[in-house]
Amino acid sequence: MASSKGKIISISSVKGGVGKTTMAINLAGLYFMMKKRVLIIDADFYSGGISTWLDIRNQKDIYMMIDSISNNRYSSIIDYVTSYNSGIDVLASPKDPRSALKIEAKYIPMIFEFAKREYDVVLVDTNHLMNEVNLMILDHVDVSLLMVTNDLIDLKNMRNLIQIFKSTDKTNYFVVLNCSRDTGRDYLSLFDIRNILKCNIDYTIGNSFYIKNIDKYVLNGEILTLNRSVNRFHGGDVAKLKKIALKLLESGEEESEQEESN
C-alpha cells in the first residue's frame, strides 16, 4: 500500500480544449516512470475523456463509488478503479451522464482521503466549469495546475479564478501556458498575458510539443510520455514536463509539512 500522504493534484482550466486532459495523462506517465502508484480521477463528469484516451473498458465509475459510500456499501476504492497498466489506475467519470447530476460536492473530500491511502499520486482531471464540485476539488487538493492558452477569453476567465485564489490567500497553484495546442495562435505576447492574468506564468509548453498525429496515440490508448518515439523527437519538451511533475510533488510535500507543523 502507498503512503497515507499521497499527493492530490488537480489539472484545471476555465475553458475547454486547452490540453488539460492531455497534461493529466502525460503527468501520469511521468509519475509511473518515477515508480509512483498513480490514480487518475476523471472529474469531468459530463464529458470525461480519460477512459477513451487510454482505451480502457471500465465497468465501475465514480458515481458507483459515491452511491456505495452513501449507502454504507463502500469497502475499498480499488473496487471502483480500472487499471491501465501495472502502476496507473483510473477512476472513471459516470458512464451515464445523467448520473453526473446526482454527484454531490460533499463526497469529494472523502474520495480524496480514500485515494491517498492507496496511491502515491492522485491526478484529478476537472472540467472547466466553476461549479460547486470543481470549487470543492480546488479547495481540497494539495496543489493545482492551471492550464491557459493564448486566447483572450480564456485568459480573462482565468484571471477571475486567480483573483478568487488571491482573495482567499490560496497559493498552492501553478499557471501553465500551453502553446502546443494551437500553434498558430500567438496573438498576445508573454508580457501581455502576464498583464491580463495579473500574475506570472510558471511554465510554458512550447509549440515544439505540438503532436500533429496525436489521434494515432489516442486510438492506440498510448500515453505520450511513455512512447519511445515521442521521447526521442521531443526529449526537451518531455524533460520540461518532468520538471513540472517534480515541482508538483515538492509543492505537495511543502503543504503537508506546513499542515503538520500547525
Question: Where does each model-flagged region fall?
Answer:
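Cytosolic-facing regulatory segments adjacent to core modules
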Residues: 69-133
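Phosphate-binding loop that captures ATP/GTP phosphates
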Residues: 31-90
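G-domain G4 guanine-recognition motif of GTPases
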Residues: 14, 149-150, 173-185, 204-211
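Well-ordered beta-strand positions
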Residues: 121, 143, 199-203
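Walker A (P-loop) phosphate-binding motif
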Residues: 2-39
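Beta-strand-loop-alpha "switch" segments that mediate conformational coupling across diverse proteins
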Residues: 181, 193-225
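Inter-motif core of Ras-like GTPase G domains
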Residues: 114, 129-151
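Acidic-aromatic/histidine active-site loop/patch
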Residues: 1-8, 163-168, 172-173, 218, ...
